Regions:
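Short alpha-helical functional segments enriched in proximate histidine and acidic residues
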Residues: 24, 59, 102, 128
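Conserved alpha-helical segments that form or flank metal/cofactor-binding pockets of metalloenzymes
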Residues: 45-73
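A short, structured beta-strand-centered segment in the mid-to-C-terminal lobe
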Residues: 78-95
Length: 189
């Protein structure tokens, strides 16, 4: 059984997510750029936006994370260190003309992992700036499906047990992406 959505659904979810996050941050304004993002210690909203831009930049540029994920993501942040938040959003939006047509052709499940990462950070930003929303978006469904699919491939009984948990896709995503404490997870069942 696969929990993954179709490549076209995954691609559409990413386009919707990017459009939503760009609009959210444009409305919030440059003033939120230096807002700390509690779920990404040592990162600000601008740094998370730099990573969101860096993902498609690196995908198109053939830059792979290698063994050091922290160095890879830090390079994305460093690349845009001197850019304003608004210029990062402009570049991310413009990137759509190049990446959107090829998204449906990304390898499975890498395409869903791409959306999983972006969706996780959308909600990190939302939490940081106090703008809850998009908890039932297609991107959340893609991200939760990616996690469930990954769990389904593991032989451990605990992984299989997690597949039977009946919480919202949003809570499943936040719990299994390290954004919930043990107490918060217990409260949700």
């Amino acid at each position: 059984m696969t929990y993954l959505l179709s490549p076209d659904e995954v691609a559409a979810a990413y386009v919707e997510l990017r459009t939503r996050v760009v609009a959210l941050l444009r409305e919030a304004g440059e003033g939120v750029a230096d807002t700390p993002v509690p779920h990404c210690p040592a990162w600000t909203v601008k740094m998370v936006a730099s990573h969101l831009l860096g993902l498609p930049e690196d995908s198109l540029g053939g830059i792979k994370p290698g063994d050091d994920l922290d160095a890879w993501t830090q390079a994305q942040v460093d690349r845009h260190r001197n850019d304003s938040l608004m210029s990062i959003l402009d570049a991310w939006e413009k990137m759509g003309t190049t990446i959107d047509p090829i998204l449906p052709h990304f390898p499975v499940p890498m395409n869903s992992q791409f959306v999983f990462d972006a969706c996780t950070h959308e909600h990190d930003i939302r939490a940081a700036i106090g703008k809850v929303g998009a908890r039932d978006s297609q991107a959340v469904r893609v991200a939760a499906g990616f996690i469930r699919n990954s769990l389904s491939l593991l032989p451990q009984p605990e992984a299989q047990e997690l597949l039977r948990v009946t919480i919202s896709d949003f809570d499943f995503l936040r719990s299994l992406s390290g954004r919930r404490s043990v107490e918060q997870i217990a409260e949700r069942g």
